[in-house]
Structure formats: structure tokens, C-alpha cells
Amino acid sequence: MSEKITVVALGHRALGTTLPEQKIATKKAAKAVADLVEAGNRVVISHSNGPQVGMIHTAMNEFGKTHPDYTFAPMSVCSAMSQGYIGYDLQTAIRAELISRGIYKPVATILTQVVIDPYDDAFAEPEKIIGRVLTEEEAETEESKGNFVTKLADGTYKRILAAPKPQKIVELETCLLYTSP
């Protein structure tokens, strides 16, 4: 009998908003994943990266202020960076938890890209909140660069992005290789 595939989705802020919080959250997730593996499941994990991609984007922008010879990192690159380090933390924590239980199964991270419709309605009204809290002055600076900002209920500001509906996962065939019996 083949193992059942279980998909675990770690939603918005499930991994925390700072690197120390993420380390704690990935260890907690690793225990739950190891429980599923012990129960005979093959596990695929999907995760959000909003807080992390915002943090990376902010860090890259701040770095650019003191090192102008470095090129600005577009959001797509920041997203890939966040997938890489989230995947690394999850992969490391899951592998360690499995080994501590005497389970020796491969654990891998796959970075993914999606194809979107460039005319998706989400571009007309961006609403995915990312990054740190901005002052009013910082919000105005972001808007002057062509970025979208929203004022939150508490009077603070944050960057927002469009979140168009994915049409296709570019690496789907690779993902399917890992879920085949």
C-alpha cells in the first residue's frame, strides 16, 4: 500500500515575523510533520512568505542606501530569497526531527515561480500587506517611488502589493516527481 500524501499549508504569519520566531515555528512544524510521517504519510509543505519577503525587501532597500553600487533587488528576487531561507529552516528542522525519531527519509526544498495574468484585477487594487510599519514620511517616499502604501486602522502605514491569482506553477513537474510513488 502506498503512503498517503498529506499537504500542510503554513499560512500567513504561521512562521512568525522575525528570524528567531521563525526558528521556533519551524521546530514546532517539524514535530507535526514528523508525526504525520510516523503515521505513514508522505508530506508536502506549502508556506506563506509575506512577513519574510517584506523584511528582505526592506533590508535590501536599506543596504542600497549605504551601498549605492549594489543593484536594487526586485520583489521577485526578494520572494525567491525568502523561499530559500524559509525552505532551509523547514528542511533542517524536519530532517533533525525525523533523525531524532530514527526516521531516515529525504527532505528537500523546491523554490517555485508562478505564471500570472498581467491584467489580473488585483493590480488595480493591491491589498497584500508586506514589510515593516512605515512612518508617514517613509510612506510618502514609497509612494513617490511608485510603490503602493496603505494606512492601517491604528494610523500606521505599510507597503502593499498586488496578489494576482496564480495561473500555473512553473516547477509543477518537478514537484510531481517528489510526490510520485
Regions found by a protein language model. Name each.
Residues S2-K4, A14-T17, E21-I24, E62-D69, ...:
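Active-site loop-to-helix "anion-binding N-cap" substructures in soluble metabolic enzymes
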